[in-house]
C-alpha cells in the first residue's frame, strides 16, 4: 500500500531504492481513522436516532496522509524529491548530522533557531550573507551542510545535544529501543503496562496514549485469549433476549 500510494517513492536516500516506513503506518493510521469515523457515527446516532455506515479504506487513508506533497502535485504538478539524511524539503538546516559517535537531528524551523545555532558554533563561515535567510541557505545548502558536518564530527552526540538543549535549539538523538525505554521521560509518562500472560508469562507492552478525564491506566487488563470470554458473552446475550423490549429500542 505504501508503494501504491506514493509513500515509498518519497522515502529514502536520493540515490537509493524506494523505501517503506519502518512501521506499518498505513495499517495503524487506518485504525485511528476508523475510530474517529465510529465516534462521529455514534455521536450522530445520539443526536438523530439513526445509525450510519462508516466507509473506510486503507487506500483512502494513505492518500489523505500525503498531505502537502499531494497538494503541491495536484495544484502545480510539483513532485517532492527525496533529500539526503531525512532533510526537510525547504528548511535548512533541518536533518540528520553525524557526531564523532552517533547520529542526531537538528531542526531550525525558524530564523531564531538558526541564529542561535550559528552563534553557538562560532564558526566565521556561518556568518556569510549566503546563509542569512531560509531562501539563501536552501540555495547554498550543500556548502552549508559541508561546514556543519566538519564542525559536528568533533564532539560526541550527547555533548552536542546538551549544548543545543541549553540554547533551546530543536534537536534530538537517534535512539534504539533500549534507549527509548530507558529514557526518564518515557518512564514518567507511565506508558508501559506489565502483566502475567496465561501462556507467555510476564509480558510488557506500550499502552494507548489516550489518557483523558478520570481514566486510570492501572485498571487496564490484557487482551483476552481466543474464546476466553465466550460463556460470559453468551450469558449476557441470554439476559438481553429475556428482557422485555423497551420503547424506542
What are these regions, as identified by a protein language model?
Residues 84-89, 94-95, 139, 200-203, ...:
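Short Gly/Pro-enriched turn/cap motifs at secondary-structure boundaries
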Residues 1-104, 108-109:
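Active-site-adjacent "lid/gating" segments in soluble enzymes
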Residues 92-167, 171:
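Aromatic-enriched alpha-helical interface/lid elements that frame and gate functional surfaces
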Residues 62, 140, 179-183:
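Beta-rich nucleic-acid/ligand-interaction surfaces
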Residues 132, 200-238:
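Flexible, small-/acidic-enriched active-site or ligand-binding loops
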Residues 166-218:
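A glycine-rich dinucleotide-binding beta-alpha-beta segment and adjacent secondary-structure elements
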Residues 239-249:
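Single conserved hydrophobic/aromatic residue that forms the stacking wall/gate
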Amino acid at each position: 500500500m505504501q508503494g501504491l500510494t506514493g509513500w515509498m517513492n518519497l522515502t529514502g536516500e536520493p540515490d537509493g531504492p524506494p523505501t517503506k516506513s519502518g512501521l506499518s503506518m498505513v495499517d495503524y493510521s487506518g485504525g485511528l481513522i476508523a475510530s474517529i469515523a465510529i465516534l462521529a457515527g455514534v455521536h450522530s446516532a445520539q443526536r438523530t436516532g439513526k445509525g450510519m455506515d462508516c466507509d473506510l479504506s486503507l487506500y483512502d487513508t494513505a492518500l489523505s496522509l500525503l498531505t502537502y506533497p499531494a497538494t503541491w502535485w495536484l495544484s502545480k504538478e510539483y513532485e517532492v524529491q527525496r533529500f539526503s539524511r531525512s532533510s526537510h524539503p525547504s528548511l535548512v538546516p533541518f536533518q540528520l548530522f553525524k557526531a564523532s559517535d552517533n547520529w542526531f537531528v537538528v531542526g531550525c524551523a525558524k530564523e531564531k533557531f538558526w541564529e542561535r545555532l550559528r552563534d553557538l558554533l562560532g564558526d566565521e563561515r556561518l556568518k556569510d550573507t549566503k546563509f542569512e535567510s531560509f531562501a539563501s541557505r536552501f540555495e547554498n545548502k550543500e556548502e552549508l551542510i559541508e561546514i556543519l558536518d566538519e564542525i559536528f564530527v568533533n564532539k560526541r552526540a550527547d555533548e552536542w545535544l546538551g549544548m543545543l538543549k541549553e540554547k533551546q535549539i530543536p534537536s534530538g538523538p537517534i535512539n534504539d529501543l533500549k534507549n527509548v525505554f530507558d529514557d526518564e521521560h518515557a518512564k514518567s509518562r507511565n506508558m508501559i503496562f506489565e502483566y502475567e500472560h496465561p501462556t507467555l508469562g510476564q509480558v510488557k507492552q506500550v499502552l494507548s496514549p489516550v489518557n483523558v478525564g478520570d481514566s486510570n491506566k492501572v485498571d487496564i487488563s490484557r487482551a483476552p485469549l481466543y474464546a476466553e470470554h465466550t460463556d460470559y458473552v453468551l450469558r449476557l446475550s441470554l439476559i438481553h433476549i429475556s428482557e422485555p423490549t423497551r420503547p424506542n429500542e
